[in-house]
Design a protein with these regions (language model features):
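GST-like domain detector, emphasizing the conserved glutathione-binding G-site
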Residues: 1-77, 81, 91, 98
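Residue-level signal for nonpolar/aromatic packing positions in well-ordered secondary structure
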Residues: 38, 90, 109, 140-146
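GST superfamily/GST-like fold recognition
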Residues: 53, 100-124, 134, 139-140
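Short helix-capping/linker segments at secondary-structure and domain boundaries
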Residues: 61-65, 119-127
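Alpha-helical packing segments of well-folded alpha/beta enzyme cores
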Residues: 79-86, 136
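Surface-exposed helix-capping loop/turn segments at secondary-structure junctions
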Residues: 92-103, 144-148
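C-terminal end-helix/capping segment
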Residues: 129-147
């Protein structure tokens, strides 16, 4: 809730608001290509990783049985390989760069970190062989802003 009582509820909308009032460092990229790459990877992280992890969690975890009605364990299990397939793609991409969308930290890194952190309660393990994902996640999670 803002000082004037305005409520912003969606995480990307909140991040865009903060970027407008505090533009440095930019979370949504700079220049036409940089902004496009951040949007591309943000959507990939959200739709291919976070959603798969969320479906697994909501349909498998016992604490969610009252929230996800009906809770369909088969659907939760079906989403686990989707998350892992995306992580394999991400691992290949991260072999050539430090951050998800290029040379700078962005909202795509934030979304990816949250998704990977959420894999534990969703009962999805990050495969050991995904060294680039593990390196990237470790670096992102070690940032002071990730501990806030």
């Amino acid at each position: 809730e803002l000082d004037d009582g305005t409520v912003i509820t969606e995480s990307v909308a909140i991040c865009r608001y903060f970027e407008e009032i505090q533009p440095q460092p930019p979370l949504f990229g700079t220049g036409a290509l940089g902004k496009a790459r951040v949007e591309e990877w943000q959507r990939r992280m959200e739709l291919n990783l976070l959603m798969a992890v969320a479906h697994a969690f909501r349909h498998i975890h016992p604490a969610m049985k009252e929230w996800e009605v009906p809770q369909i364990a088969e659907w939760g299990e079906a989403n686990k390989p989707k998350a892992l397939d995306f992580l394999a793609l991400l691992d290949r991409e991260l072999a050539n760069r430090e951050f998800a969308a290029g040379d700078s930290y962005s909202i795509a890194d934030i979304t990816g970190m949250v998704a990977i952190d959420f894999m534990k309660p969703a009962r999805i393990a990050v495969p050991e062989e995904l060294a680039n994902v593990r390196r990237w996640h470790g670096a992102i999670a070690a940032r002071p802003s990730a501990k806030a």
